């Protein structure tokens, strides 16, 4: 069932992410809320505060200094746990803490193994840095609204294969993705669910044990529509039979 509003979706997302993180200590997870016009930062800060109450420390990482500074401003209680992708990578590859004002000032001893890294809004341009961050981290990682797919043109077959292998490691802890005439949802540990948009709202259409591609979604929606038409025609036939008696 689709959540009726953002706060319900958030609650579902947080619960699903906690469920996912409680499993594999080296898990690679994604969380996607793809609403048009969504202000992602407040959601991410609420998520970070929620996870910060757990046993494992968190690091909240952003693509650039501007986004990190905005997060520190809006979430001052998390400021010491906020940095950019590149700042964190430099710190994790060095025994010395980075200078104050450039990112994290509370390095985690032991190689950050127990930390949960939360990477927000990683794009294709960030792919190399994100891959390096993840390779240097032995603990759990969460990508929030990532956009790492594509961008492999011109890097050669070896590079493309390496990228496919890296992207294949990730599993959705939570996803709520509006599509044209439908919506896709996944809440760990349950299956992916596809919903069809009807005049009176969304209706469940199909479930999948993997993230369905466009062809699979279209096939499920067409099959669902055909089933609906068939039921309607049978109802009309029964009505006509009743009138003729």
What are the language-model segments listed below?
Residues 1-125, 136, 239:
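Positively charged, amphipathic N-terminal segments that serve as targeting/anchoring signals
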Residues 60-63, 90-92, 148-152, 172-175:
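Short C-terminal domain-edge/linker segments immediately following a structured domain
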Residues 152-227:
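A conserved mid-domain beta-alpha-beta active-site/ligand-binding segment of alpha/beta enzyme cores
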